[in-house]
Amino acid sequence: MMEDPLIPWLTEHGLVCHPHTLSGTPISLGSAFQLAGLKLAWRVEIEQRRVWIVLIQRVEQRRGLKNPFAALYMLANAARAVLGPDYYLYGNVDVLAGSSLSTQRLAHFYRRWTGAKELSTGWFSLKVSQVITLSNMKKRQNNGFA
């Protein structure tokens, strides 16, 4: 697997990145970092112009998340800065273990509030140039723009 082009940018912004493998085997699935109570693993696919989100997982048991979108926002910023605005975040929507939120409700959120496109059941794509902060998302919601 090629060197991940996002790692230098993420490292410059204070994150520690490491390889992410399949269940502890030597099979590489991409790279990962931890931020705001979550572990996020991804793989850049240059040919498809996408950043495939391989895993989002709580690193602490049900203590609440500071901002559940902070890791995704950081990844989108890295992709936009390094790869350009025409890349996409891509991944399968599933709720975090132990969450009371349903997969359907989370999928609705991604479609309605983020503008993500559901390419096939549960698989979403969102242009990195469209990713906004949670604060801005709430402002849009409160002003009726979502």
From Swiss-Prot:
Record keywords, A-Z: Calcium, Plasmid
InterPro entries with a match to the protein in the record: LcrR/CesD2, T3SS_LcrR
Transmembrane annotation, as ranges: none
Keyword Calcium among record annotations: yes
Superkingdom classification of source: Bacteria
Its biological purpose: Involved in the down-regulation of lcrGVH transcription in the presence or absence of calcium and is necessary for lcrG protein expression in the absence of calcium. Plays an important role in the regulation of the low-calcium response.
Protein name, UniProt field: Low calcium response locus protein R
Organism phylogeny: Bacteria, Pseudomonadati, Pseudomonadota, Gammaproteobacteria, Enterobacterales
UniProt gene name: lcrR
